[in-house]
Design a protein with these regions (language model features):
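Structured secondary-structure scaffolds
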Residues: 1-48, 100-104, 155-365, 406-408
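Basic, alpha-helical terminal appendages of large translation-related enzymes
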Residues: 1-5, 45, 49, 121-126, ...
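Short, glycine- and charge-enriched coil/turn segments that flank and shape catalytic ligand pockets
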Residues: 2, 142-143, 177-179, 218, ...
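N-terminal, positively charged nucleic-acid-binding surface of large information/translation enzymes
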Residues: 2-180
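A non-catalytic, amphipathic alpha-helix used as a structural packing/dimerization or gating element
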Residues: 32, 70-81, 351-358, 387, ...
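Residue-level recognition of alpha-helical structural elements
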Residues: 68, 184-187, 348, 374-381, ...
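Amphipathic alpha-helix face/heptad-repeat signature
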Residues: 344, 348-351, 355, 377, ...
Length: 516
């Protein structure tokens, strides 16, 4: 039987500088969803990558006395290093400088031109180099970019334009017919208001930028970086040559993006697909920003956070957990090291870590390290575990990672409460209570096994550590990711150091800028 497919993407990240917390947030969220869908037996295709053309990169390379390709190669290595450290499980990493992407973009651009949706005109207005965005004078205050607040440049040049205005009604109709196309609801309402306002055709080429894909019918122009970038979602599937892969996975089930690029994904991208007569993605989820003291995190503001420094100090899974637990996905969140340390000490150390440590200590003390086996009818936490499993499914469907984790920690709380109520240390004092002691510790072991499956999408390393200590993993065996499995008779625990040792206040990092 063929598995049901699930195609999800992050944006491809602009490589004018090294990756920061915002890049890692989007990618960790996508990775958690990909891992969850895999253990639900979906055939997952998870795409991420890098956006490597444009004026900003051309200027950044010049400032470093490098060619553009030398510059982007050096930055792409840093993205790959961070993704490896974060245990990102992407199925493909696309680069817009790759030959196959460039060839496919040219073909698609040519198709848009032949359909009459691209024409040569003259653009006169303002352009933001850092955001690679065109703006009308009427959209600006004091010539400042509405997104990054930097001063825009006055531009007047011949450009090729895409007939975006032609698709205004079709876009509105599509949004009304697909009310869940953009999530969360507040973002959808914002973008709908913009679509209802007059929409102008957009410039999709540059004549003064050399670093880009040449326009196929006019090599004196290069294709605007945002059109080049958006097309990655279909070029990665080999839309022209390997049509089987494209037919298998498209349309994408979800594009996970930051809210600042919703116009491109929620308006321009659907219109381009409509022109190409390609189905639109099923969902776009635009999450919020991380802030420090209420300001968006960015290197230019001097408040960027270095993910590698956090990982080195606090661990990968603690970082992944914090980002996905601290803030409901879709809202803005404020980052602070004290908040991170509190989550580690309270949630990971006290709640989860102590549950594992106490359970294993009692199994070691009362059963010589062999996990007592219980049957379902004796397992008093099993129905709560099933409820948790079902709640997680609902939250993950809505990309509500924080609420999914809240449900997991509620179950962890039930397991800790179960220890206090059953008092296994008291049961151990009477041989007559041995059957009860077997039931209690066997129930706790099975609860921990279920917890290890629940947390896997968010904290895969911790899942491995728990399952190894529960005696489930041989030297080369794979993780046990099926829900509510029974222990084999004679399974012996392998107690190790605490999962998350307590962090003292004096070891807390201060806010630090991304390292050069």
């Amino acid at each position: 039987m063929n598995k049901k497919t699930f195609y999800l993407t992050t944006p491809i990240y602009y490589v004018n500088d090294i990756p920061h917390i915002g890049h890692s947030y989007t990618t960790i969220a996508a990775d958690a969803l990909a891992r969850y869908k895999r253990i639900q037996h979906f055939d997952v295709f998870f795409l991420t990558g890098t956006d490597e053309h444009g004026q900003k990169i051309q200027k950044a390379a010049q400032a470093c006395n490098k060619t553009p390709i030398e510059f982007v190669n050096s930055v792409v290595k840093k993205f790959n290093t961070l993704w490896n450290k974060l245990n990102i499980s992407q199925d493909d990493f696309i680069r817009t400088t790759s030959e196959h992407h460039c060839l496919r973009v040219k073909k698609l651009f040519q198709q848009l031109y032949e359909k009459g949706d691209i024409y040569l005109g003259e653009y006169e207005g303002r352009y933001c180099v850092p955001c690679e965005s065109f703006w009308l004078e009427s959209q600006l205050e004091q010539d400042k970019c509405p997104e990054c607040k930097r001063t825009t440049e006055k531009v007047k040049e011949k450009n090729y334009f895409f007939r975006l205005s032609k698709y205004q009604k079709r876009l509105l109709d599509f949004y009304h017919q697909h009310p869940n196309f953009v999530q969360p609801e507040s973002r959808k309402n914002e973008i709908l208001q913009r679509i209802k306002s007059p929409i102008e055709d957009i410039s999709i080429s540059r004549s003064a930028v050399e670093w880009g894909i040449p326009v196929p019918m006019d090599p004196t122009h290069t294709i605007y970086v945002w059109i080049d970038a958006l097309l990655n979602y279909i070029t990665a599937l080999g839309n022209d040559e390997d049509t089987r892969k494209f037919q298998k996975y498209w349309p994408a089930d979800v594009h996970i993006i930051g809210k600042e690029i919703l116009w491109f994904h929620g308006v321009i991208w659907p219109a381009v697909l409509m022109s190409l007569k390609i189905d639109l993605p099923r969902k776009i989820f635009a999450h919020g920003w991380w802030t420090v003291e209420g300001k968006k995190i960015s290197k230019s503001l001097g408040n960027a956070i270095d993910p590698l420094a956090i990982i080195q100090t606090y661990g990968v899974d603690a970082y992944r957990y914090f980002l996905l637990r601290e803030v409901p996905f879709g809202l803005d969140g404020n980052f602070s090291y004290p908040a991170l340390v509190h989550r580690i000490n309270a949630d990971l150390g006290n709640d989860l870590g102590n549950l594992l440590q106490r359970t294993l200590t009692m199994i070691e003390k009362y059963f010589q390290g062999t996990i007592p086996v219980v049957v379902d009818s004796e397992d008093e936490l099993r129905s709560l575990s099933q409820d948790t499993h079902d709640k997680i499914a609902g939250e993950m469907e809505e990309l509500q990672f924080s609420r999914a984790l809240e449900n997991i920690w509620e179950f962890i709380g039930h397991a800790n409460k179960y220890i206090e109520e059953k008092k296994p240390w008291t049961l151990a004092k009477s041989s007559a209570a041995t059957p009860q002691l077997i039931r209690v510790l066997g129930t706790l072991a099975r609860a921990l096994q279920d917890i290890s499956v629940f947390i896997y999408p968010f904290m895969p390393i911790t899942t491995e550590k728990i399952q190894r200590q529960l005696g489930l993993l041989e030297s080369n065996s794979s993780l046990h990711l099926e829900f509510q499995q029974n222990f084999r008779e004679g399974t012996v625990i392998r107690k190790e150091n605490p999962l998350f040792p307590r962090i003292e206040k004096e070891s807390v990092l201060t806010e630090r800028v991304v390292s050069e």
